[in-house]
Structure formats: structure tokens, C-alpha cells
């Protein structure tokens, strides 16, 4: 971690981008290395924006969704394809070589399905989306063959549906970064399920069920060979599970805290107000967790078996809650986006190249930026279950 930790400690603002129209920045994805160097950002006004990753200049925008966006991700083997999912019941694929054009693929399932999470497998072959709960009963994992050309929707390309593993909104879907058949899903029912899709149907594919004890907000694969799962809950709980222990008698839980906000207090005492998310730093083989305060202050923390350790506090950037971040290992840069509509690029020893001081948002602008798509649910009723090594375990 030493080399990366030194870089994190030296971060300062290098670039700053603000849209003409105020909006919340909800999620960010980086185009795979070796391409034209694009960042995709999902916004609370249902648009997807493309930025140059080095200058943050806006290079394009996609409009087509009519509901809250639940994420964006670039394909790996076809990095000119960008996917976005939405509560409007569609997952759309865009060609980033033609900014502003219509989606080249539109994936749908049942008209009653509203997606609140999605992901693409590491082989780009399989697409999966998690739905909101329907009629206070069912929620679904929907699978498509992403290689089939689907325009106009209509449910074309749907391979199947899992319907028994969650009992509430499926807030997270995460494919394993290296294993195309390994999938993790998280829900407001408090459960994180791990599937091996090569094993057959839903019951056979379910390898483990872990209980977060609260509504699941974020799930990330991490650790050596990505054998661990980081789970952050909507009420700021943190859980780290080692799936490498599935076939042993050792416990899965590496670390667990029902409220992680005070685990790594900054110099002025207290703790963070919320957790933004986590990211596995491949080059350093360490897990980075980012937390923040409502005034925009950010705290970079390392997470391991001992809990959280503060690495760096970033100030003078955002003016309100930060909603997304990513670490660009090749570019040695941190990218953050938030409810103040700002996209920031932090680099070691960076000197801000945009003119003028940080513009404080007026209360009127803040109100204008609020929308149903931007409201992050902080707690939901959940069912109590212990984790299981597989579905047949007691």
C-alpha cells in the first residue's frame, strides 16, 4: 500500500467540472485502459454524460431514459459500448464513438419490472438487472444475452429470471471481475447472495447467503483473487466476508460493524456522516473505503481485518454530499462526483486548472437539483436471516 498510500496522501484538486444545469452526479465509470480515456457519469436528470478523464471536459450526453438511473458501466471486451440501467424498466447500450445518438441496444423484461441495479459480466456476455419489489411480494434478477442485438425492447434476449432469493428491492448486482459465472446480489431485505451461474437453476446456483443485518446499499468484490465481498448498508454498516472459506469450517466474516462512521476518526475527532463506497486497489492489494461529511469533506480509509484506518482527508472540493468515486490506477487519480453537481479530479500534487474559486450552491439551486432519482434510501425494513454456506444449510 505504501506507494499508493503516498499518492493518496498527496492528492489535491487538479480539475473541476460543473454542468450548466444543476444535477446530482450519482455514479461514475471509467473506460478500460488503452481507449480514448472517457468517464461516464449518471445524473439525477436521467441523462448520461461523457467526460474526458484527464480534462473533465464534456464530450457528449445521452438522453433516452425516463426514470431514475441505477448505474453506468463500460464493457470490457467492447469498450466503446457503455451501459446504463434505469427504473424506467430498461438497460440501454450506447456507442461512445457517437455521443448524443440513440441507444444501440435496449434490454427489457416484464413491463412491471423497474430496475434499481444492474451489471455486465467480465466477458461482456451476460447482463443482469435487479428489480424493485412488486406488489409487496416478489423481486427478480433478470438475465439477458448481451451479445444479442435488441432494439426497441419487448423482452427480446431474456435468458431467464431468479425469483426466490430476495424478498425486497434488489439494490446491488455485481459480477465477479474475473469469473464470468460468479454473481453477488444485495437487497433491502438485508441479504447478500452469491451465485455460481454455471451450476444450473437458482437453487443450485445459490452458493452463499450473508446477512448484513440491514438494508444493503453497496456490494464490492475485493481481496486477493477477488475472493472477498465488501458490503455497506444504507445505515452505514460495514461488513467484510471471505468467500474463500465457503468450503472450510472457518467463519466467513472477516470484519463487521453495524455503524462504521466512528471507526477512523479524523484529526478533529468525531467521524464521518456517511460512507460513499469501497474500491479494491489492484496495484496495492488493498481495500479503499471512502466516507464523507455533509459539507463535502472526504475521508479516504483503508479497510482490513482490523477495521478502518484513516489515510487522508480531502477538503476544499465538494460543497455537499459526495455520491460516487473511482480510483484510476493508470492515471494515478481519484474522481469524485456529488450532489453539488461537481465532478472533481484529484491528483498527487495537483493544481486546479479551472479558473475561479469554488462556487457555493444557493439553496434555490440545491432545491432544483432534488428529485426522486437522487434520494438515497437510508433504511428499510429487512428480514433477519443468518448467513448460510449454501441454500440447503440450516
Predicted regions span which residues?
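WD40/WD-repeat beta-propeller blade N-cap
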Residues: 16-25, 62-69, 107-115, 162-170, ...
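A short helix->beta-strand "capping" segment at the edge of beta-propeller domains
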Residues: 2-24, 55, 307-314
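WD40/WD-repeat beta-propeller blade-loop signature
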Residues: 24, 35, 58, 68, ...
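WD40-repeat beta-propellers
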Residues: 48-52, 85, 91-96, 139-145, ...
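Beta-strand-rich domains and repeat architectures in extracellular enzymes and scaffolds
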Residues: 18-44, 276-277
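Loop/turn-rich, solvent-exposed surfaces of beta-rich toroidal or solenoidal domains
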Residues: 232-236, 257-307
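Conserved strand-to-loop turn within each blade of WD40 beta-propeller repeats
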Residues: 42-45, 85-88, 96, 123, ...
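Loop/turn segments within WD40 beta-propeller blades
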Residues: 28-36, 73-80, 119-126, 174-181, ...
